[in-house]
């Protein structure tokens, strides 16, 4: 019993210094990677690509009769659960933009598809930089992955919404106990969706192996921050509506930009947490060492990939 208590004390005594070292390293890593600058860049690209993405998504869903009206439900669900306050104004503006794209030619539609691919490509590049990945995926593989996201993604989302609507319509949910449990599940559904979306992003996008536990921690941090930021941002907009006095009818535009920027800050922060957990050997390094180790790691991975390519050609 005494040995067990001593082992727990030893673990606790080592836990505090490890946590301090981790948070110091994380802060230095955030500074080195200029997360705030990259979040602004991704927010700008997102605003340029959000209409093309919605257009591609809705056009794919419209090809399947079983997903009729799913596009409207999907837009409403996203606005209600993932865009805090002024969601109706943003929803109306996006609907007008998407409706106008229906007048475009096939060439214009092709450019919309390219713009949607650009957004996914930039997300891929930024996350791989956080993980110090130098060995890029082959162009064919990258294009196949982006194509799969743009085609299978809407189908899976539409299928999940259709399944949820079917379950909701079942008479079995008239039971008070089951109905209460289902309502509780729906209340936690946005957080669960955020968690699994972040987890998939941190596990699948980097072109290197990421431990599931590290990805789960980063995804949990990002999902919790995302839910808290929704409530905080909505509170700020409703309690301090000075932006409406300045921008008037155009107030939805800066609101959307600030919200998208905040979302990318959270996404990149969760990615930094995930990547830092896998670099425990560097937790004691200073900022200069972080910079040099990052550059050397990228150089080593690049030389290893070139060596493997040479050996394959031989």
Curated annotation (Swiss-Prot):
Predominant location = membrane
Signal peptide limits: none
Keywords noted in UniProt? Cell inner membrane, Cell membrane, Membrane, Transmembrane, Transmembrane helix
GO cellular component terms listed in the entry, alphabetical order: plasma membrane
Disordered, as annotated region = 295-314
> Which NCBIfam families would you find in this protein's record?
PRK01637.1 (NF002457), yihY_not_rbn (TIGR00765)
Q: Which family does it belong to?
A: Belongs to the UPF0761 family.
Per its record, how is this protein called by name? UPF0761 membrane protein VP0125
From which source organism is this entry?
Vibrio parahaemolyticus serotype O3:K6 (strain RIMD 2210633)
């Amino acid at each position: 019993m005494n040995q067990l208590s001593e082992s727990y004390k030893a673990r606790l005594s080592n836990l505090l210094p490890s946590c301090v070292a981790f948070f110091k390293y994380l802060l230095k890593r955030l500074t080195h990677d200029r997360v705030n600058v990259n979040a602004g860049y991704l927010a700008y690209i997102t605003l340029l690509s959000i209409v093309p993405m919605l257009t591609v998504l809705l056009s794919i869903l419209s090809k399947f009769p079983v997903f009729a009206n799913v596009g409207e439900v999907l837009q409403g669900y996203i606005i209600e659960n993932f865009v805090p306050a002024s969601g109706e104004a943003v929803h109306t503006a996006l609907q007008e933009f998407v409706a106008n794209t229906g007048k475009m030619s096939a060439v214009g539609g092709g450019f919309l598809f390219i713009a949607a691919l650009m957004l996914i490509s930039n997300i891929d590049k930024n996350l791989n930089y956080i993980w110090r990945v130098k060995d890029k995926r082959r162009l064919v593989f990258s294009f196949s992955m982006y194509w799969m996201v743009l085609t299978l993604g809407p189908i899976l989302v539409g299928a999940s919404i259709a399944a949820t609507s079917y379950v909701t319509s079942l008479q079995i949910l008239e039971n008070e106990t089951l109905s209460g449990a289902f309502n509780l599940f729906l209340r936690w559904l946005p957080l669960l969706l955020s968690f699994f979306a972040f987890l998939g992003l941190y596990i699948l996008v980097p072109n290197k192996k990421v431990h599931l536990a590290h990805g789960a921690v980063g995804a949990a941090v990002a999902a919790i921050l995302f839910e808290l930021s929704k409530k905080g941002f909505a509170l700020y907009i409703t309690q301090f509506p000075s932006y409406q006095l300045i921008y008037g009818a155009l107030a939805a535009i800066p609101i959307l930009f600030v919200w998208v920027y905040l979302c990318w800050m959270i996404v990149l922060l969760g990615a930094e947490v995930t990547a830092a957990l896998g670099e425990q050997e560097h937790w004691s390094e200073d900022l200069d060492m972080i910079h040099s180790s990052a550059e050397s790691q990228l150089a080593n991975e690049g030389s290893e990939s070139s060596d493997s390519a040479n050996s394959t050609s031989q």
